[in-house]
Design a protein with these regions (language model features):
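Bacterial N-terminal signal peptides
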Residues: 5-15
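Extracellular carbohydrate-recognition regions
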Residues: 21-50
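Beta-strand-rich interaction surfaces with strong enrichment in secreted/lumenal proteins
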Residues: 24-25, 73-80, 145-151, 195-196
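Carbohydrate-binding surfaces in secreted/extracellular proteins
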Residues: 39, 89, 153, 158-181
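Short carbohydrate-recognition loop motifs
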Residues: 53-72
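Secretory/extracellular carbohydrate-interaction modules
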Residues: 68-134
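Short, aromatic/His-centered strand-loop micro-motif at the edge of beta-sheets
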Residues: 135-158
Length: 215
């Protein structure tokens, strides 16, 4: 029988880890818990859709990566209608170069086509980007706020993304939060979208996803 310390080492080696403490929002207070995913099984939970790249559940974590043959970033999503909300998720770079965590407008909310915003993270920086309107050739994406930061490969980090009204705040434990706003951010969203960049075999691991209403 494994000792508790040996069991913890095995869990960490396989990919899972102890849940991080809840990060507290600054735009409001947490309301109802809308979603909790611990990825304890060996199959993708209901509500997730893999579109491009690799996506699997193993060792207590969600593994995601880009595939060269797809010719685009690894893309997957979790359906969850929401508006004002707080999203907390743990992530760990395992070779991959970057991740985007995005929200889109629900159908009928805006005339704009494309994403509302993304929190983009690489091992050297992170930002909040407002995306272009794909229906407008003159529209361009722009980083509303960015910061140079180091995120080590093989280390778990906990990210909190808050959205309330026209404001978005992104917090990573131990880092100064990023804050941005836009007149379009207040709309209803159909779920959470993720992108991963990197070479074949390079991954990002995700774990302990929780989403709350933000009041």
């Amino acid at each position: 029988m494994l000792k508790p310390s040996s069991l913890l080492v095995l869990i960490l080696f396989l990919g899972g880890h102890s849940p991080a403490a809840d990060l507290e929002p600054t735009l409001g207070k947490k309301g109802s818990l809308l979603l909790e995913e611990k990825f304890d099984g060996d199959t993708l939970p209901k509500g997730w859709t893999g579109k491009t790249g690799g996506l699997s559940v193993a060792g207590g974590a969600l593994h995601a990566g880009q595939k060269k043959d797809d010719g685009r970033l690894g893309l997957f999503s979790r359906e969850l209608p929401m508006q004002d909300a707080a999203i907390q998720i743990d992530f760990k770079f395992a070779g991959a170069r970057g991740i985007n965590i995005s929200c889109n407008p629900s159908p009928g909310e805006l005339s704009k086509h494309g994403h509302l915003f993304s929190v983009m993270i690489t091992q050297r920086m992170w930002n909040i980007t407002e995306h272009n309107d794909k229906a407008d050739r003159n529209s361009v994406s722009k980083a509303l706020v960015s910061a140079m930061e180091s995120f080590e490969s093989g280390k778990w980090y906990s990210l909190l993304v808050e959205m309330k009204g026209d404001e978005v705040v992104a917090t990573i434990e131990g880092r100064k939060p990023l804050r941005a706003s836009s007149k379009d951010f207040h709309v209803k969203k159909p779920g959470i979208e993720f992108r991963v960049s990197g070479r074949d075999g390079e991954e990002v691991l995700f774990d302990n996803l929780r989403v709350w209403e933000l009041k």
